[in-house]
């Protein structure tokens, strides 16, 4: 669920998903066009991952996971819940690895500036 993903982001980056990632660059949030930096690419990959489990309720399905010893571990559940958890875990870890690229200028980045043709495909 979005609430759980936010907790994973905060665990990994020490930044809350809201406001730091909810509307960052061209992909964090609604997503579209070309990622602005490595942080935004994490969101692109997360969108692609969610696209692979489109039949699942990615925004609201509550899954099992734990945050221990610096690691996120996804628990057992339905196929959908396990896949959503993995998408969120991988994205949160990617955001941590990309902290050095985070630019405040991309917070609340206007969609109107995300018009370049896509550079990547899922």
Swiss-Prot record:
Source species taxonomy: Eukaryota, Metazoa, Chordata, Craniata, Vertebrata
Domain of life (superkingdom): Eukaryota
Expression across tissues: Expressed by the venom gland.
Record's keyword terms, sorted: Blood coagulation cascade inhibiting toxin, Calcium, Disulfide bond, Hemostasis impairing toxin, Hydrolase, Lipid degradation, Lipid metabolism, Metal-binding, Myotoxin, Secreted, Toxin
Cysteine pairings via disulfide bonds: 26-114, 28-43, 42-94, 48-122, 49-87, 56-80, 74-85
Entry GO MF terms: calcium ion binding; calcium-dependent phospholipase A2 activity; phospholipase A2 activity; phospholipid binding; toxin activity
Major localization class: secreted
GO CC field: extracellular region
Subcellular location: Secreted
Protein's UniProt keywords contain ATP-binding: no
UniProt catalytic activity: a 1,2-diacyl-sn-glycero-3-phosphocholine + H2O = a 1-acyl-sn-glycero-3-phosphocholine + a fatty acid + H(+)
Residues that hold Ca(2+) according to the record: 27, 29, 31, 47
Alphabetical list of InterPro entries matching this protein: PLipase_A2, PLipase_A2_Asp_AS, PLipase_A2_dom, PLipase_A2_dom_sf, PLipase_A2_His_AS
Single Gene Ontology BP annotation: venom-mediated myocyte killing in another organism
Task of the protein: Snake venom phospholipase A2 (PLA2) that has a strong dose-dependent anticoagulant effect. In vivo, intramuscular and intervenal injection causes muscle necrosis. Induces moderate edema in the mouse foot pad. PLA2 catalyzes the calcium-dependent hydrolysis of the 2-acyl groups in 3-sn-phosphoglycerides.
Name by which UniProt lists this protein: Basic phospholipase A2 9
Enzyme class: hydrolase
Co-factor note (free text): Binds 1 Ca(2+) ion.
Pfam families xref list: Phospholip_A2_1
EC number, UniProt record: 3.1.1.4
Active site: 46, 88
Cofactor(s) required, per the database record: Ca(2+)
Similarity remark: Belongs to the phospholipase A2 family. Group II subfamily. D49 sub-subfamily.
């Amino acid at each position: 669920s979005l609430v759980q993903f936010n907790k994973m982001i905060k665990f990994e980056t020490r930044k809350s998903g809201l406001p730091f990632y909810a509307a960052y660059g061209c992909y964090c949030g609604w997503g579209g066009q070309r990622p602005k930096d490595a942080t935004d690419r994490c969101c692109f990959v997360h969108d692609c991952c969610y696209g692979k489990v489109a039949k699942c309720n990615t925004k609201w399905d509550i899954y099992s996971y734990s945050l221990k010893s610096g690691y996120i571990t996804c628990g057992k559940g339905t196929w959908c819940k396990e896949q959503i958890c993995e998408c969120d875990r991988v994205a949160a870890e990617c955001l941590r690895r990309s902290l050095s690229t985070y630019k405040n200028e991309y917070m609340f980045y206007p969609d109107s500036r995300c018009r370049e043709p896509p550079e990547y495909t899922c």
